[in-house]
């Protein structure tokens, strides 16, 4: 049974501006596993796409959960890593989580479906 569906869309330029102004942004948004992947990218545009995609995923997850970020879950409580096929995955106790992330040059979006 579906518990919730969440969608988020963000401008990559917004994340890029935050990244330039806030030195701790990566630590606030990404888990250690996600930071490892982020640091593997040499291209700044690809780093911003990844960061924006994970930001959107965590927002979408919190919307699907029904609580929003900050109430019951924070950015670093949500670990979105890729499986061996490259598919983004979130493991969260009590739920089967379906994740889709996409981006263009200017936008990143994510959809999350939670099943119980």
From Swiss-Prot:
SUPFAM superfamilies given in the database record: 4'-phosphopantetheinyl transferase
Ligand binding (Mg(2+)): 8, 59
Superkingdom as given in the UniProt entry: Bacteria
E.C. code: 2.7.8.7
Subcellular location: Cytoplasm
One Pfam family here: ACPS
Protein family per UniProt: Belongs to the P-Pant transferase superfamily. AcpS family.
Record GO terms (molecular function): holo-[acyl-carrier-protein] synthase activity; magnesium ion binding
The reaction(s) this protein catalyses: apo-[ACP] + CoA = holo-[ACP] + adenosine 3',5'-bisphosphate + H(+)
Name listed for the protein in its UniProt record: Holo-[acyl-carrier-protein] synthase
Function: Transfers the 4'-phosphopantetheine moiety from coenzyme A to a Ser of acyl-carrier-protein.
Cellular component terms (Gene Ontology): cytoplasm
Keywords of this entry: Cytoplasm, Fatty acid biosynthesis, Fatty acid metabolism, Lipid biosynthesis, Lipid metabolism, Magnesium, Metal-binding, Transferase
Main location, first listed in the record: cytoplasm
Any one of the GO BP annotations: fatty acid biosynthetic process
Obligatory cofactor(s): Mg(2+)
